[in-house]
Design a protein with these regions (language model features):
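Bacterial N-terminal signal peptides that target proteins for export
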Residues: 1-4
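Classic N-terminal secretory signal peptides
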Residues: 6-8
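C-terminal motif of bacterial Sec signal peptides marking the signal peptidase cleavage site
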Residues: 11-15
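Functional surface patches built around histidine and acidic residues
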Residues: 16-164
Length: 164
């Protein structure tokens, strides 16, 4: 019985997260090299933005303003991460959202995609997905882009939305 109790206590100790570990996560370094924003495929991103703003305007919503700074730097960083994974991912969205909020954003949303080779095709896919459409039609004022093409020609997209 003593051995069973000791084994149970060891198991419980191994599966618990300490307060120190939580604190480390909460104070993660959210700094970014703003020059990463320059690595996005701006002609493709501008076309995506034009299509999204046309859609928003048709609904009576204000268009989004492109953020060529922090939001795009974080979007490019995430797109590079997805390219490394060779798949789309929302991993660490909370960190990107927190970083943008630290820079004045009130609310933040994100759409990701891969494999679309035109702006129209990725926007159509997002509009046909309720959760992605919600971001496109959301109460946001600005947007940042991480649009990148791999060596094999496959596009990856990260679009961050935020309200100032």
């Amino acid at each position: 019985m003593t051995t069973s109790l000791l084994a149970l206590l060891l198991l419980l100790n191994a599966s618990c997260t300490t307060e120190d570990a939580i604190e480390t996560i909460e104070t993660a370094d959210l700094s970014i090299d703003i020059n990463l924003a320059n690595e996005t495929d701006w002609p493709m991103a501008d076309e995506v933005l034009q299509l999204i703003n046309e859609h928003r305007n048709n609904l009576g919503l204000s268009g989004l303003t492109a953020d060529h700074g922090y939001a795009s730097a974080y979007a490019v960083d995430h797109t590079k991460y997805m390219i490394d994974l060779e798949r789309i991912s929302d991993d660490c969205f909370a960190d990107r959202a927190r970083a943008l909020k630290n820079n004045g954003a009130i609310s933040v949303g994100e759409n990701v995609a891969a494999g679309f080779d035109t702006a129209q095709s990725v926007v159509n896919a997002w509009l046909n997905s309720p959760s992605h459409r919600e971001n496109i039609e959301g109460n946001f004022t600005h947007t940042g882009f991480g649009v990148m093409q791999t060596d094999t020609g496959r596009y990856y997209f990260t679009q961050l939305f935020y309200k100032k």
